């Protein structure tokens, strides 16, 4: 009994230490690659070989919307101000300065998006190499996770199952998926295609829900039928 507890404690310490070390390693590598190597290269390519101001149509729409909002705010402030009456020359100068500021911001956003694409690809390649060469460590972590899941009571297993399904495939999950896809597209500098986003939100949670139910039927129902019964009762 004591040996089992010591073994479990040792596995827990190893898993936590390994995951934290990997997380810090990949975060550090990502920042170094992005800011010291790939971003300067992307900045050189964009500023020397690209004539367009915007990377995609979505970025252009966002910048124009910000410029329009700024113009409306300026006009409103001048209309209600007794000290500074409405002056077209002042408005034009302020608009010109704001346009240059937004153009500079758009330029940096485009450079960052290009650098993110190459950095993400390199990090994905490093993770793939890690999965191939660290099979022993991954097997230890997988064994620990299995033991931890098996040690949970049926009520706790059912709670985590319901929590997972409600977050990823629940009624309100579509809003979260929509925000996540928009953030990913912006991160990679891709246009925010509304049709693609709506199609993804309409189909991906359904596919995920189907795979989850298939996993319950094929795997969980075999190793822990009581947990499945508790899960169904809690769902009802």
Swiss-Prot record:
<keyword id="KW-0406">Ion transport</keyword>
<comment type="similarity">
    <text>Belongs to the CemA family.</text>
</comment>
<feature type="transmembrane region" description="Helical">
    <location>
        <begin position="114"/>
        <end position="134"/>
    </location>
</feature>
<dbReference type="InterPro" id="IPR004282">
    <property type="entry name" value="CemA"/>
</dbReference>
<keyword id="KW-0630">Potassium</keyword>
<protein>
    <recommendedName>
        <fullName>Potassium/proton antiporter CemA</fullName>
    </recommendedName>
</protein>
<dbReference type="GO" id="GO:0015078">
    <property type="term" value="F:proton transmembrane transporter activity"/>
</dbReference>
<keyword id="KW-0050">Antiport</keyword>
<dbReference type="GO" id="GO:0009706">
    <property type="term" value="C:chloroplast inner membrane"/>
</dbReference>
<keyword id="KW-0812">Transmembrane</keyword>
<keyword id="KW-0633">Potassium transport</keyword>
<keyword id="KW-1133">Transmembrane helix</keyword>
<dbReference type="Pfam" id="PF03040">
    <property type="entry name" value="CemA"/>
</dbReference>
<dbReference type="GO" id="GO:0015297">
    <property type="term" value="F:antiporter activity"/>
</dbReference>
<keyword id="KW-0375">Hydrogen ion transport</keyword>
<comment type="function">
    <text>Contributes to K(+)/H(+) antiport activity by supporting proton efflux to control proton extrusion and homeostasis in chloroplasts in a light-dependent manner to modulate photosynthesis. Prevents excessive induction of non-photochemical quenching (NPQ) under continuous-light conditions. Indirectly promotes efficient inorganic carbon uptake into chloroplasts.</text>
</comment>
<keyword id="KW-0934">Plastid</keyword>
<keyword id="KW-0472">Membrane</keyword>
<feature type="transmembrane region" description="Helical">
    <location>
        <begin position="196"/>
        <end position="216"/>
    </location>
</feature>
<feature type="transmembrane region" description="Helical">
    <location>
        <begin position="161"/>
        <end position="181"/>
    </location>
</feature>
<dbReference type="GO" id="GO:0006813">
    <property type="term" value="P:potassium ion transport"/>
</dbReference>
<keyword id="KW-0813">Transport</keyword>
<keyword id="KW-0150">Chloroplast</keyword>
<keyword id="KW-1001">Plastid inner membrane</keyword>
<feature type="transmembrane region" description="Helical">
    <location>
        <begin position="18"/>
        <end position="38"/>
    </location>
</feature>
């Amino acid at each position: 009994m004591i040996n089992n507890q010591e073994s479990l404690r040792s596995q827990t310490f190893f898993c936590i230490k390994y995951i934290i070390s990997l997380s810090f390693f990949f975060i550090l590598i990502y920042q170094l690659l992005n800011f010291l190597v790939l971003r300067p290269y992307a900045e050189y390519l964009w500023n020397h070989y690209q004539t367009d101001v915007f990377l995609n149509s979505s970025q252009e729409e966002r910048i124009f919307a910000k410029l329009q909002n700024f113009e409306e705010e300026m006009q409103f402030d001048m209309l209600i101000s007794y000290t500074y009456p409405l002056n077209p020359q002042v408005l034009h100068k302020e608009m010109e300065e704001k346009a240059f500021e937004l153009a500079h911001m758009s330029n940096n956003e485009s450079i960052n998006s290009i650098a993110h694409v190459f950095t993400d690809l390199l990090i994905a390649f490093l993770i793939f190499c890690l999965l191939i060469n660290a099979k022993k460590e991954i097997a230890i972590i997988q064994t620990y996770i299995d033991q931890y899941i098996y040690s949970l009571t049926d009520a706790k297993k059912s709670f985590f199952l319901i929590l997972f399904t409600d977050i990823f495939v629940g009624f309100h999950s579509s809003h979260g998926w929509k925000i996540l896809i928009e953030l990913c597209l912006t991160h990679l500098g891709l246009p925010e295609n509304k049709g693609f986003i709506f199609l993804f939100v309409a189909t991906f949670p359904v596919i995920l829900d189907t795979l989850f139910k298939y996993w319950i039927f094929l795997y969980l129902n075999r190793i822990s039928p009581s947990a499945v019964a508790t899960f169904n009762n809690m769902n009802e």
